[in-house]
């Protein structure tokens, strides 16, 4: 691409680099200059303009952005992604359903390394997205790029971004109580909102005494495909009431504790084919906490190993909820 300032007499057919006010009105940047445009610019007192001209092997910014998007998303249905139209060198990628965004960072870094004028910016890996939520934007910075650079950027990029949708339809939240009083429904409302935005229904309310036998019985009778436990007393050890109840019911505990705050006291396990999440007390708040990161992956059938949870510590210091009984600074 050739870029620079030229006399008006040499500018016809070139791409205007900066918006200008002519005698007939504003000529937007990116416009292909016509003879009429040049006459209007001359009438406005311009003698020269800054323009770009594409060379034989260049791709226009819009065509380049769309071509790269199609290279990245070669299967819109399979990758669960919708490609937008192109404009001003930009194409956006949108989720076709709710879910979590999965990325191949190595492949995407290679896209951005091909040429400084060719860029893609994405949300983080495992980011929760709603239907029609934007998950990436492709921007060609210059008015055109060489076809060779565009080919290099797209090579190996196919399938490097996709949206994993939820696979479950229902969940049961089992709450325990430490007194005869019914717990406030704050936690149920917060969890119901989390499940609803991922397309899951919450089964009727279940409240049992904070005892292993009662909780184990509730787990065996729970109708949901995903089982959630919110205890009236914090779970502070792998041998505490809730993890022990899961084992007593015939389930397994695969992980207790996570390096995300708020969210440290989460535990993860399974009961037959059903995933089980022991929720930390912060799940009663709709604010982001460690349980969200685990819940969203579980609902989308993404494996969550102990190593995965251990890796959440970097970036795991989240905003403290206002109602926290013991704020960090006072501990």
Task: Annotate each predicted stretch with a short phrase.
Residues 32-33, 49, 129-136, 141, ...:
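Generic structural signal for buried aliphatic residues
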Residues 1-88:
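Short, low-complexity N-terminal leaders and the immediately following helix N-cap/first helix
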Residues 203-331:
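Short glycine/threonine-rich loop/turn motifs
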Residues 43-47, 70-77, 131-134, 140, ...:
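Generic secondary-structure signature for well-ordered alpha-helical cores
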Residues 26, 32, 125-128, 259:
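Residue-level "contact hotspot" at macromolecular interaction interfaces
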Residues 9, 13, 42, 83-86, ...:
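Solvent-exposed alpha-helices and their adjacent loops that cap or buttress functional pockets
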Residues 55-166:
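Extended, charged alpha/beta regions that create polyanion-binding interfaces
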Residues 131, 141-228:
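Phosphate-binding glycine-rich loops and their immediate beta-loop-alpha structural context
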